[in-house]
Amino acid sequence: MGRMHAPGKGLSQSALPYRRSVPTWLKLTSDDVKEQIYKLAKKGLTPSQIGVILRDSHGVAQVRFVTGNKILRILKSKGLAPDLPEDLYHLIKKAVAVRKHLERNRK
């Protein structure tokens, strides 16, 4: 975050790990991770939600390092990818919510 009373803009960014190899302590194989992705996608979760669950619950920091593909590519190969891109879906959802709010709270 930037400073209010200084010209600096701050350095808030996420840093990728230096090593792009699978950690030695990770016991899941590529097929195990793919099965988890399929199972979570069938529940209706988005690719970013799947990544958060894999990171927090299963210890998979980067799916791409373990499987060789990103989550969305894995879902597309199985035919489980969402029909709208995730960012576009959330923009549409927000626009609908703003319209609904403006209809209710007209001056």
Swiss-Prot record:
Keywords: Acetylation, Cytoplasm, Isopeptide bond, Nucleus, Phosphoprotein, Ribonucleoprotein, Ribosomal protein, Ubl conjugation. Transmembrane segments: none annotated. There is a cross-link at residue 27 (Glycyl lysine isopeptide (Lys-Gly) (interchain with G-Cter in ubiquitin)). The modification Phosphotyrosine is found at residue 38. GO terms for biological process: ribosomal small subunit biogenesis; translation. The modification N6-acetyllysine is found at residue 27. Its main location: cytoplasm. The modification N6-succinyllysine is found at residues 27, 34. Pfam families: Ribosomal_S13_N. This is Small ribosomal subunit protein uS15.
